[in-house]
Amino acid sequence: TTAEGMPVSWCLAHPKVGEREVMTALLERDHHLVRSGQVILADKGFAGREFEAFLTERLGVHLVRPDRKDEPARHGRLARVRQWIEAVFDTLKGQLSLEQHGGRTPAGVFARTGQRLLALAAGIWHNWTIGAKIKRSLIAYDH
């Protein structure tokens, strides 16, 4: 997502596929959505030399993630950033009922997940358009 929580790219993946592999596939497919010099915020699960090399060398982006205990401090405490990222997930799960999608087939899950992401994007876009102070707030649309 963008800083305001606008969905940029997404996919559904088998739960046994690692986060780094999924993110690599998304970025290879949607490489035109990132620009050299951009920062990607992620959690500790994205630690890995090969993945970070892909981001830096192939895409020219910088990965910022919490430091693992076995590595030197690089970016300091990122608790506020983590809270900010989790707030986007909370919006999807809470207000948009992402976890109670009701899809019974892979196609149904895909369609209903897409509906929720589109609803979030429409709300953020509308808030941008009207100049709302908080772009990700969906309270005005929560009927």
What are these regions (language model features)?
Residues R35-G108:
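Helix-centered, glycine/charged polyanion-binding patches within enzymatic domains
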Residues E57, K93-A107, G123-H143:
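A short, flexible helix-boundary coil/loop motif
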Residues E19-V22, W84, V88, G114:
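Catalytic-loop motifs flanking and including active-site residues across diverse enzymes
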Residues C11-H32, V39:
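Active-site beta-loop-alpha junctions of metal-dependent nucleic acid enzymes
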Residues L92, V109-A122:
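Charged alpha-helix within mobile-element recombinases
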Residues T2:
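Short, acidic, Ser/Thr-enriched surface-loop or helix-capping motifs
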